[in-house]
Structures are given as structure tokens and as C-alpha cells.
């Protein structure tokens, strides 16, 4: 009896976690398409087959969902960038740059909705969450700055930072200029241009 109750409890938790994941996916899609202010709780609920008020079982507010989307992706980028550096520790500095470019392209081409949301709706977040996102993003940029200076020691931190931001602009432009079906077609060109800009600088 106890085992059955525990199993049922685990199953409920799994279903709740799955619905929460689906709400995040639906939220990313809807907010990217309509903007944060253009999405209602009823829209979020309908996208996963629940009522608007039922969304509160998973998120205390629409803002909380936005926070989880943008804080979450910022932290995943930082963690992923650190993993790239760890994987290439002691290797050719150029391979670190290539690894970072490949990692960021995976993000830009795989989660374009989040780029669009950040570009347009970052200011809709509470101040503390927005500061957290910006702080985490700065840490991510500094990974690139350090990697660039290892390849090109003559670059100042400021120069390396400008180049990193320019390449982010190139890679992050994809959600605004390419459809999902275009993603793999444009990837080789984006990779080539990014590496030329970063590894080929003089």
C-alpha cells in the first residue's frame, strides 16, 4: 500500500514536471511570436491543454515564467561555455574558439525564440532578475574575451570584448533572418565567418 502511494506520488510529480516543461516551451514560442505583453495566462494554459488559472500551479506569475526562461538560458550558456573551456584545457587556443563558436551556434540555431525574447522583453523582468541575467551574460562574454586574448595576446580586453560582441551579433541575428528550415543550411557560413573574425584577426 505504501509502495503504491509512493509510486502514485512519483507519477504525479513526473506529470507536473512534464507540464511545467511544456509551459516553458509554449511560453518561449508565444512570447517570441507576440511579445511578453501580448501573451495572456489563458494563452499559456491553452497551449498545453489547461486553464489560465491552472498555470499558477506551476508559476506564481507570467513574469516568473519569463524570468525562468531568460535566467535559465543565461546560466546554461555560462555553464556550457565553461564546459568548452574545460574540455580544451591545455590544448590549442584556436580549438577553444572553435568550440565556443560551435557551442553558441547550437544555442542560436536551436533556441532562436529565446534570443528574440531577450532582445525585446528583457526589460519586462523584475530589476533583480534582469541584473542577474546581465551579470551572467557578462561572465559568459569574459570567457570569450579570455579565449581571444590567448589566441591574440596583442588584443586589449576592450578590443577582444568588442570582437566577441560583434560575433555574437552575427550568430544571434539568425532568429531574425532565417527560418527553422534554414538553420542547418546557414550554419556553415555563420561558422566560417565567426572563425574568420575571431581567429583571423590581426
Segments predicted by a language model, with ranges:
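Hydrophobic alpha-helical connector segments
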Residues: 68, 82-110, 163
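Helix-turn-helix
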Residues: 22, 26-64
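Short, structured motif recognition centered on aromatic/hydrophobic residues
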Residues: 22, 28-31, 77-78, 97-101, ...
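Generic hydrophobic, amphipathic alpha-helix propensity
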Residues: 19-27, 44, 69-73, 77-80, ...
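Amphipathic alpha-helical segments used for helix-helix packing
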Residues: 108-128
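N-terminal intrinsically disordered/low-complexity leader segments
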Residues: 1-18, 202
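Amphipathic C-terminal alpha-helical segment
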Residues: 107-110, 157, 164-184, 195-202
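Amphipathic alpha-helical packing segments from all-alpha helical-bundle domains
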Residues: 75-78, 127-152, 161-165, 188
Amino acid at each position: 500500500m505504501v509502495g503504491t502511494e509512493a509510486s502514485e506520488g512519483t507519477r504525479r510529480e513526473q506529470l507536473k514536471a512534464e507540464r511545467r516543461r511544456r509551459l516553458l516551451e509554449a511560453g518561449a514560442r508565444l512570447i517570441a511570436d507576440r511579445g511578453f505583453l501580448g501573451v495572456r495566462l489563458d494563452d499559456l494554459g491553452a497551449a498545453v491543454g489547461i486553464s489560465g488559472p491552472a498555470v499558477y500551479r506551476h508559476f506564481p506569475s507570467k513574469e516568473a515564467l519569463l524570468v525562468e526562461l531568460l535566467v535559465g538560458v543565461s546560466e546554461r550558456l555560462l555553464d556550457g561555455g565553461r564546459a568548452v573551456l574545460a574540455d580544451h584545457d591545455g590544448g590549442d587556443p584556436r580549438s577553444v574558439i572553435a568550440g565556443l563558436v560551435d557551442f553558441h551556434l547550437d544555442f542560436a540555431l536551436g533556441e532562436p525564440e529565446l534570443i528574440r525574447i531577450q532582445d525585446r522583453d528583457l526589460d519586462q523582468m523584475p530589476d533583480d532578475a534582469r541584473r542577474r541575467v546581465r551579470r551572467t551574460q557578462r561572465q559568459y562574454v569574459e570567457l570569450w574575451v579570455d579565449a581571444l586574448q590567448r589566441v591574440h595576446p596583442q588584443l586589449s580586453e576592450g578590443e577582444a570584448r568588442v570582437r566577441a560582441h560583434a560575433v555574437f551579433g552575427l550568430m544571434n541575428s539568425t532568429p531574425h533572418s532565417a527560418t527553422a528550415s534554414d538553420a542547418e543550411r546557414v550554419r556553415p557560413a555563420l561558422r566560417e565567418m565567426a572563425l574568420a573574425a575571431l581567429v583571423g584577426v590581426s
